[in-house]
Curated annotation (Swiss-Prot):
Residues 384-401 are annotated as: L13 loop. Keywords: Aminopeptidase, Cytoplasm, Dipeptidase, Hydrolase, Metal-binding, Protease, Zinc. GO terms for biological process: peptide catabolic process; proteolysis. It is found in: Cytoplasm. Zn(2+) 1 binds at residues 379, 459, 461. It holds the Pfam family Peptidase_M17. Homohexamer composed of dimer of trimers. Both the identity and concentration of metal ions available dictate the extent to which oligomerization occurs; Mn(2+) and Co(2+) induces oligomerization, whereas Mg(2+) has no effect, and Zn(2+) causes irreversible protein aggregation in vitro. The L13 loop movement regulates the transition between active and inactive conformations by repositioning Lys-386, which, in turn, mediates the rearrangement of the binuclear metal center. Optimum pH is 8.5. Active between pH 7 and 11. Optimum pH is 8 for the cleavage of the Cys-Gly dipeptide. Its main location: cytoplasm. It comes from Plasmodium falciparum (isolate 3D7). Zn(2+) 2 binds at residues 374, 379, 399, 461. This is Leucine aminopeptidase.
Length: 605
């Protein structure tokens, strides 16, 4: 404004020179249109300059010299009059319009058979692995006590040959030899440590050692002999983890999928009292795919997974499972006055999409449950941009992990078909981006329950979307509301990468979640909601601020914020920010699918 007022006293010719100099120095680099005949010249006419108000008085076309003398600067813009080719908005025609999802994976083709170990184990082909421990001796020698129905292999596995190796957790060895039928077989072990009862973390280390051997060897058959004691839940967890870790996600590679990968066709398991474990096999396969389905959504980059394509994937899933579904668009959300949720998505080119799938069992419904997943398909932080070291902006495609867990649970529930329940799978999906339309720090927005919220930080967006989703869930008249979200990075500091935190307003419901945590082997720790911290959310101008005035206990304070949007319904909030992503393996865990499914199947009634 100051510069323009000075220029009005200059002659027109001098003013034009100053304007042109500014355009050349400040704006040309982002708006260069090359002449095909001469890459050093661009034609910048009045139409191009009209977007800069101080250039509107220029009366002629002007040829500018290319100031950087470099060939090829891509500049993409969206024309308001452009008609989109598909439901998913695109900047250029090459932009993806759907999320590639594998429904039939090689794991589904593996034939699994469970045998009783009392009859001895056969070593016929492929790889045979003994899971061994030595209670009380962490580095104790390997001793294989199972009967082996093969003389050559049995001779090799005698104590004098194996005692040079130890059972330290995760250690493994395998050897090639000929069996009695002169067939080449691989036989080995995985150490399970010194404890009699393995934890889920211990079992995962065992499985990872086993998967490494499978990936290193092209085999058609795997046989696992359990010389350790496991209950049914841990046995199922072994199978789920084996299937999940064995499967590789190569959807976005240009080469043929799994061109160098040959999956086994048969899995044999020897264990005591085999009949009690057989029923867990198919359930494990369902849990595996529910988790892998969620993982596929989380792993999909944000140019593939956006609010529209994610809602399309939810509809596709519902149709496959015969679930009821509806997707609410911006118009319906405006009618529901979801101002908090709508504000977060204002900066994105993709419209908000609210996912609502419903499973209704046949017969009497004893419990109605709403599962609510946070669904931010990419979180830039908004105007409070994730620019600081450690903000992990490159990983923010995973901020819809809660939504993915809920949809993965929908797959499991729709497949296993529990009785006497009605389940609502909900997610307020949007993208938190920076643009001229984005909501700003300091804005005051109104949620669907009428509460006004001062936006203290645009990077505290998840709680705003969940606020309206929780209000929506309670209006469904459900008995329980459980939300699951990558809500606060503080969970990494409080519980690390192994445990999720659970908060809530109902002790009975939280205990059900904790029990589901044990049976699903997805660890959850009960954290308190401390009401005296509510004062840190006070706002001078609105009913509440979306961020605390203190940096302390931010996960608890975030739960206090959510609590404001649930009135009379039992509610639990599960924060999975620390456990959703496997940082070492650089892939999603799909955390929460088994936890929520176990809750629905066994603990909700």
């Amino acid at each position: 404004m100051y510069f323009s007022s000075l220029c009005k006293f200059l002659p027109i010719s001098e003013k034009e020179k100053i304007y042109l100099n500014i355009v050349k120095k400040r704006f040309c680099k982002s708006n260069i249109y090359y002449n095909n005949n001469n890459n050093n010249i661009i034609n910048y006419n009045k139409r191009g300059l009209k977007f800069y108000p101080f250039c509107n008085n220029l009366k002629k076309n002007i040829n500018f010299v290319n100031i950087n003398n470099k060939k090829g600067i891509n500049f993409h813009s969206i024309n308001k009059e452009r008609k989109m080719a598909s439901e998913v908005p695109q900047v250029v025609s090459l932009d993806p319009t759907s999320i590639p999802i594998e429904y039939n994976t090689p794991i589904h083709d593996i034939k699994v058979q469970v045998y009783d170990i009392k009859g001895g184990c056969n070593v016929e082909e492929g790889l045979t692995i003994f899971l061994v421990n030595n209670p009380g001796k962490e580095n104790g020698p390997v001793k294989i006590s199972s009967k082996v129905n093969d003389k050559n292999v049995s001779e090799f596995l005698k104590d004098e040959n194996m005692e040079k190796f130890n059972v330290k957790l995760g250690t493994s060895k395998h050897f090639y030899m000929f069996n009695d039928n002169k067939n080449s077989v691989a036989v080995g072990y995985v150490g399970c440590g010194s404890v009699a009862d393995l934890s889920e973390a211990d079992m995962k280390r065992v499985v990872l050692s086993l998967v490494t051997m499978l990936h290193d060897n092209k085999l058609s058959k795997l046989t696992v002999v359990f010389e350790i004691n496991v209950d049914k839940n841990l046995f199922r967890f072994f199978l789920e983890t084996l299937f999940y870790e064995y499967m590789t996600d190569e959807r976005f590679k240009s080469t043929d999928k799994n061109v160098n990968m040959e999956y086994i066709k048969h899995l044999g398991v020897y264990i005591n009292n085999a009949d009690t474990y057989k029923e867990e096999v198919e359930k494990a396969r369902v849990y595996y795919f529910g988790t892998y389905y969620a993982s596929q959504l989380i792993a999909a980059p944000s140019n593939y997974c956006n609010p529209v394509s994610l809602s399309n994937a939810a509809v596709e899933l519902a149709q496959k499972l015969n679930l009821e579904y509806k997707i609410l668009g911006v118009k319906e959300l405006e009618e529901l006055k979801m101002g908090a949720y709508l504000s977060v998505g204002k900066g994105s080119m993709y419209p908000n999409k609210f996912i609502h799938l419903t499973y209704k069992s046949k017969g009497d419904v004893k419990k109605k449950i709403a599962l609510v997943g946070k669904g931010i398909t990419f979180d830039s932080g908004g105007y409070n941009l994730k620019a600081a070291p450690g903000s992990m902006i490159d990983l923010m495609k995973f901020d819809m992990s809660g939504c993915a867990a809920v949809l993965g649970c929908a797959y499991c529930v729709g497949t296993l078909k529990p009785e006497n329940v009605e389940i609502h799978f909900l997610s307020a999906v949007c993208e938190n981006m920076v643009s001229k339309n984005s909501y700003r720090p300091g804005d005051i927005i109104t949620a669907s329950n009428g509460k006004t919220i001062e936006v203290g930080n645009t990077d505290a967006e998840g709680r705003l979307t969940l606020a309206d989703a929780l209000v929506y869930a309670e209006k469904l008249g459900v008995d329980y509301i459980v939300d699951i979200a990558t809500l606060t990075g503080a969970m990494l500091y409080s519980l690390g990468t192994s445990y999720a935190g659970v908060f809530g307003n109902n002790e009975e419901l939280i205990n059900k979640i904790l029990n589901s945590s044990k049976t699903s082997n997805e660890p959850v720790w009960w954290l308190p909601i401390i009401n005296e911290y509510r004062a840190t959310l006070n706002s001078k101008y609105a009913d509440i601020n979306n961020i605390s005035s203190s940096v302390k206990a931010s996960s608890i304070v975030a739960s206090l914020f959510l609590k404001e949007f649930v009135q009379n319904t039992a509610w639990a909030h599960i924060d999975i920010a620390g456990v959703s992503w496997n940082f070492k393996a650089r892939k999603p865990k799909g955390f929460g699918v088994r936890l929520l499914t176990e809750f629905v199947l066994n603990d909700a009634l």
